[in-house]
From Swiss-Prot:
Name of the protein in its database record: Methionyl-tRNA formyltransferase
Record's catalysed reaction(s): L-methionyl-tRNA(fMet) + (6R)-10-formyltetrahydrofolate = N-formyl-L-methionyl-tRNA(fMet) + (6S)-5,6,7,8-tetrahydrofolate + H(+)
Listed Pfam families: Formyl_trans_C, Formyl_trans_N
Gene Ontology MF annotations: methionyl-tRNA formyltransferase activity
Record key words, sorted: Protein biosynthesis, Transferase
Gene encoding the protein: fmt
Residues binding (6S)-5,6,7,8-tetrahydrofolate, per UniProt: S113, L114, L115, P116
Protein origin, superkingdom: Bacteria
Length: 314
């Protein structure tokens, strides 16, 4: 068994917490956790700790929440921990070079894409949105550039026609931790050699924007169907009907044509809407103040609200 390493873990969301769980169950010692400051959340806007902080507190691990790692005080605090390795997963702060150089074995990152494709903040959703046939996790040695470091290990998984941003996230959150543990063992043994990324093959996964979730029915149906899956469970695609907001939780390709946004048909199978190319059948919707429902349930009680000829998005 490889030597036990003194590890500092840096991460924030649930995806990162799954990696921390695996490290806590390993032979390695997690000596400290870095995570984003508590943020207001929910209707009451109470300050809420990140999933990573909650897990660290449960296990009695010291938690650090600097607003930045660019100041000398935060850097000195990290150096005093004398870590062998820093494992970074969806942390959300830039690590300056002095921080990258602090651990004996440097810093490694678990990134939810097959690099160099989809560098950046939202690789899972962008892969679904683009219609990619596979995704995965890349463990890389970190350097100053954004997701540009040498690749230590890759694991892949197919993306199905039913995958959502949420389902792919959950699958990668299971694959990533095992890849990180394998990479750590290789680093500790000195047997792992990084592979340089081909920058010419790189593209960028921009952060999700709520404005992108508004359905533009002038676009092709195939693009909108992928967008709806990619943006589920957040931020959820939406449109309007008769002035009311309408969240779209699921859809499939339909048949027919017409002016974009026009309802072509409504029945127990779904609400078929004309797009710039083709048509989209909306199968799971949420009305204001309601919960997500299969369209067949809405149709039974609100048939007149979804009459063919009405236009969505006006």
């Amino acid at each position: 068994m490889p030597d036990s390493l003194r590890i500092v873990f840096a991460g924030t969301p649930e995806f990162a917490a799954e990696h921390l769980k695996a490290l806590l169950a390993s032979q390695h010692e997690v000596i400290a956790v870095y995570t984003q400051p508590d943020r207001p959340a929910g209707r009451g806007q109470k300050l809420m700790p990140s999933p990573v902080k909650q897990l660290a507190v449960e296990h009695g691990i010291p938690v650090h929440q600097p607003a930045s790692l660019r100041n000398e005080e935060a850097q000195a605090e990290l150096a005093a921990l004398k870590p062998d390795l820093m494992v970074v997963v969806a942390y959300g702060l830039i690590l300056p070079q002095v921080v990258l150089d602090t651990p004996r074995l440097g810093c490694i990152n678990s990134h939810a894409s097959l690099l160099p494709r989809w560098r950046g903040a939202a690789p899972i959703q962008r892969a679904v949105q683009a219609g990619d046939l596979e995704s995965g996790v890349t463990v890389m040695q970190m350097e100053a550039g954004l997701d540009t470091g040498p690749m230590l290990l890759k694991v892949s998984t197919p993306i199905s026609a039913e995958d959502t941003g949420g389902s792919l996230h959950d699958r990668l959150a299971r694959l990533g931790p095992q890849a990180v543990l394998q990479a750590i063992d290789g680093l500790a043994a000195g047997t792992l050699i990084g592979e340089l990324q081909d920058d010419a093959q790189a593209n960028y996964a921009h952060k999700l924007n709520k404005d992108e979730a508004r359905l533009d029915f002038s676009r092709p149906a195939v693009e909108l169907e992928r967008l709806i899956r990619a943006f589920h469970p957040w931020p959820i695609c939406h449109t309007t009907l008769n002035g009311d907001a309408l969240k779209v939780h699921a859809a499939e390709l339909g048949e027919g044509s017409g002016a974009p946004g026009t309802i072509l048909a409504a029945d127990k199978n779904g609400l078929t809407v004309a797009c710039g190319e083709g048509a989209l059948r909306l199968t799971r919707l949420q009305l204001p103040g309601g919960k997500p429902l299969a369209f067949s349930d809405l149709y039974n009680s609100r048939r007149e609200q979804f009459a063919p000829g009405l236009v969505l998005g006006q």
